[in-house]
Amino acid sequence: MRASAVLRSVICRTLAVALAAFAVLSAVIPVPAFAADSDQQVKTVRVGWLINNEGFQDGTPGERLSGWGYDYLQTLSYYTPGWQYEYVSGTFTELMDMLEAGEIDLMPNISYSEERAQKLLFSSNPEGAERYYIYAKPDRDDLAKGDPQALQGLTIGCNSGVMQTFVGQQWLANEGITCTYREYDGGSMLFDALANDEVDAVIMNDTISSPDASPMFYVGSSDYYFAVPKSRPDLMNDINAAMTAIARVNPRYNDEVKANYSA
């Protein structure tokens, strides 16, 4: 056999052995995933997606999504290279329980409280501010006069476990108003109940709106934040850095993204 043929044979065998060894190592050594458009490692972030909150989070995960809450998340991800969202739908109460248990990683639009801060991390800066109102149909002239006593004995719709309900019910109690409360899941269901005359009024924030509802009484306000489980300080570090970057580019972003979906 010629020397050149022997050399080719040796090279081929060596290459075959090397490829086989690489295949074995690839099977046992995990290879990190990276974002397609960067050298950043992919970080899957499970985000709570509120049902029945049109304007804030529209659509169903797996289909077309929109809303100012969705737009804010997309802007946030631009400044957090490698983030990949996985949306998990549910009611506010369900999603908060999942967040505290670490079953999801992120919830937007969460008001701060000392009780919540025992289980969650909040962004250093607020995502925005919301005002709380008692809404009624525009033709309720009795409520439009501004006298809280006109609410006496009415049936008022509210969401369970949310800040505007706590604040609104406390305001009503301070005014000496006795009402019947009826709970619904999501802001859209509240406005539907009002439109269908299931309730006389509703307690709601101004993050979503309805042409069939007018704010009659202002009952309070609060800032709201991004929140993550205490076990995910890495995510909160990313969020704080991203929010600072967004504010440097557009200090009015928090107001503008919300205004895009105002009725």
Where are the language model's segments positioned?
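N-terminal secretory signal peptides that target proteins for export/translocation
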Residues: M1-V10
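Bacterial N-terminal signal peptides
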Residues: T14-A27
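Sec-dependent signal peptide cleavage junction
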Residues: V24-D39
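Extracytoplasmic small-molecule ligand-binding "clamshell" domains
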Residues: A36-Q118, C158, N174-G176, T180-Y184
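Extended ligand-binding regions for polar small-molecule ligands
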Residues: G67-T80, P138-M163, V219-A263
